[in-house]
């Protein structure tokens, strides 16, 4: 689990996302509260439930990007799902309980990686011995007379192996043969049953080994994984993963506005209000049956987000509104924000294009007025047509760089300066003509 302070979390998000300080502060506090809760006494810890968040804002302002970056910072089981992928129980489509099953799978993977790190040294030693055994088979006769000589030779080869001198040499080793995969086609909504059937068939076959010939470098990696998996206790792994999900799990529900009931619709709405009703027990706290064991959702943090352009938060059913107590509104982006997005974040769009063209030997220089013009063009198109936020910059930049990208391989060693005049020549007609903007930008 991350032990970063709220200020450190916001600072880290600032290097990738421009503006939206209120949203950053809310998710930073929520993430830090996960750590604070774990410092409490066990009886009080059970009573402290997470304060779920609802992020509201137009498309392309950073809601999903905040989730992506948060996943890397959290160091905890994290899953991002689209609310529109689910339907009410009993209908064709995914059930919402699949969210928790996927989150548990994520925790299993995370826990396994942590346990492999802990036993990596022992696994490396065991893998090294197996490679040396393959290189220097033990003599069948006169074992006592050759013992000292064999040991000395083994140490010489061990030194060469560690220095990488034997990386390209091929050896034959016995490795665990992968279990025969059995693909079972299932209708939507029955993924859990399919997974359990596949696991059952895979566990029925004995773990046979297979002799393979490969370079030592490749064999060493394979043997480390094999030896590490032998050192891991699978039951302990499942227990730790379930504990991790229950205490630190985070679910990001994107596009939650798309499951709001529309005023004009009538009859059963299985992919809208039905999904909201099914989400209620998950968010409130229930027990979900997964193939790894029972998972309680009482302390899982839910962060929901939506543009709410065709609906409003009050269109959610009241019970779900009450379970998302923290509301954060994200601001629409201005031309000034677009300029900052082009230059300030780590691996910004301008940096990416400079690096891409650099692979062809072409040097690109963006001037201050050139960046201003790009930002202004993107903002104008957003104002005149659909406002898709920062995503418009990708479209505008791709259009701007199209000619240069096509001819770059023939212009090695050249220097191109992208200033206001260059931007005007490339984009002016498209920006001014609303019909062209609507279809091309």
From Swiss-Prot:
Binding site residues for ATP: 18, 60-65, 254, 319, 391
Gene Ontology CC terms: HslUV protease complex
Keyword vocabulary terms for this entry: ATP-binding, Chaperone, Cytoplasm, Nucleotide-binding, Stress response
GO-annotated biological processes: protein unfolding; proteolysis involved in protein catabolic process
Function: ATPase subunit of a proteasome-like degradation complex; this subunit has chaperone activity. The binding of ATP and its subsequent hydrolysis by HslU are essential for unfolding of protein substrates subsequently hydrolyzed by HslV. HslU recognizes the N-terminal part of its protein substrates and unfolds these before they are guided to HslV for hydrolysis.
Subunit-level organization: A double ring-shaped homohexamer of HslV is capped on each side by a ring-shaped HslU homohexamer. The assembly of the HslU/HslV complex is dependent on binding of ATP.
Protein name: ATP-dependent protease ATPase subunit HslU
Designated gene of the protein: hslU
